[in-house]
Amino acid sequence: MKPLFCRILLSLVLWGGGVAPGAEPGPVVLDIGHQSTATGAKSPDGRVNEYDFWCRYAGEVKAEIEAAGYSCVVLNRGAAPADKTQAEACRAAGVEQLNKPDIGARRYPSTHYPQHIGCGMVSADRAIDLHARCMVFLHLNSTGSRWLRKAPVGLIICNRRLGNELAESVCAAMKQGVPEFSQGIRVQPRFIGSQASAGWMNALDAAGIPAVVFEALYVNYRPHVDYLCNDAQARRLARTIAAGVLAWLQQHPQEED
């Protein structure tokens, strides 16, 4: 029984949300939504798609977090993009290409928690490998291929057990930093069935890692698209997300032993 007990104890230390004695706090992990071969939601006029936008601006989020003294890693589950502008932006941000794209919404079991299966699991598993302090999936939202007439409700989705405070912090930052589009924004905790496509949220919960999915702006709402196409405003959005993460980090310090 002793070897089994030791394995359980080690698992709790490594994956239970704390930092093992003598270990440095892990990084903030950002994940670029989708990949070059499946770019995610796009605006009806083709001006914005999720993958291209976050290729360009994930580095801005990372830079703000690192400037505050925290380590940060940017992941993308696919291969390096062929587009030169996207590739240069990814290189500048130091994006770690995981080379395991979600082809046809294929689902993978977690290597750490195989009972949890989902698309994008490779990114969650990498965050667990890195002992991430928290994880932010950078996305843009959409309700379909037609323009919305009314302002949609922005969402900050989070894993149910651990993500609420991080989500509330990002939500508060949005209301302050991008008030013109954030008054109706809300936090949506989710518990996903183990076989569902977003089961990676449960794997991160099991690993003790707070996680949020940024889905606050919509690519099929014209005012949002106009905002996202403005470089200065897009950078403001990236800095605002970083501000929300930093506020949470300051409330949850991890001291090095």
Residue ranges: model-predicted function:
Residues A23-V122, G144-S145:
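Active-site histidine-acidic residue metal-binding/catalytic motifs
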Residues P27-I32, C72-N76, G104, R133-L138, ...:
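Structural recognition of the beta-strand scaffold that forms the well-ordered cores
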Residues C119-L130, M201-A206:
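Mature extracellular/periplasmic domains of secretome proteins
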Residues Y51-G59, A63, A67, I117, ...:
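Solvent-exposed, polar/charged alpha-helical surfaces in well-ordered, non-transmembrane soluble domains
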Residues M1-R7:
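Positively charged n-region of N-terminal signal peptides that target proteins for export
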Residues R7-G17:
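Bacterial N-terminal signal peptides
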Residues T39-V48, N141-S169:
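A short, glycine/acidic-enriched catalytic loop
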Residues G26, V48, L140, G144, ...:
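Active-site-adjacent mobile loop/cap segments within catalytic or ligand-binding domains
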